[in-house]
From Swiss-Prot:
Quaternary state and interactors: Homodimer.
Protein name, per record: Adenine phosphoribosyltransferase
Pathways per UniProt: Purine metabolism; AMP biosynthesis via salvage pathway; AMP from adenine: step 1/1
Enzyme Commission identifier(s): 2.4.2.7
Length: 172
């Protein structure tokens, strides 16, 4: 199945000069959504995953069904102030400054094998901050899986050395 047929392209969103890749049509099509989830599950099957971690918000949309299919837990990564218990945080650079991500301080147990799942790999800032928090908690990042990679934005270089699965590539 060519999943690219289920990605909408919106020019100049969220700001002028940016091309936004919208996964909503993929999620709206049961066959395409199921196919994408199965592809990530297949990638994860031999990795002995204990936990899925997904950054908000689209990492939840992709990561939760993967966790369900694998029979493992899901740990959310969120912006500050969105998680109710003790958190750890990591900072990363965005185009116009520094941003922060958090996760519960007890989300990952030492030695747990973790798969990070998100919709998009662009510059790699979000996933790099997520890796930092997982490793700080003693987890082992067994892999990273994305629906889309935007080529030319150096996301792969940011997470060099980590096994990575991407279902589709688009120009960045």
């Amino acid at each position: 199945m060519d999943l690219k047929n289920y990605i909408a392209t919106i020019e100049d969103y969220p700001q002028e000069g940016v091309t936004f890749r919208d996964i909503s049509p993929l999620m709206a099509n049961g066959n395409a959504y199921s196919y994408a989830i199965r592809e990530i599950v297949q990638y994860a099957t031999d990795k002995k995953i204990d936990m899925i971690v997904g950054p908000e918000a689209r990492g939840f949309i992709v990561g939760c069904p993967v966790a369900y299919e694998l029979g493992v837990g899901f740990a959310p990564v969120r912006k500050p102030g969105k998680l109710p218990r003790e958190v750890i945080e990591a900072h990363y650079e965005k185009e116009y400054g520094i941003d922060t991500l958090t996760m519960h301080a007890d989300a990952i147990k030492p030695g747990q094998r973790v798969l990070i799942v998100d919709d998009l790999l662009a510059t790699g800032g979000t996933v790099k901050a997520t890796i930092e928090m997982i490793e700080r908690l003693g987890g082992i990042v067994a892999g990273c899986a994305f629906l889309i990679e935007l080529d030319g934005l150096d996301g792969r270089q940011a997470i060099e050395g980590y096994d990575t699965k991407v279902l589709m590539n688009f120009p960045g």
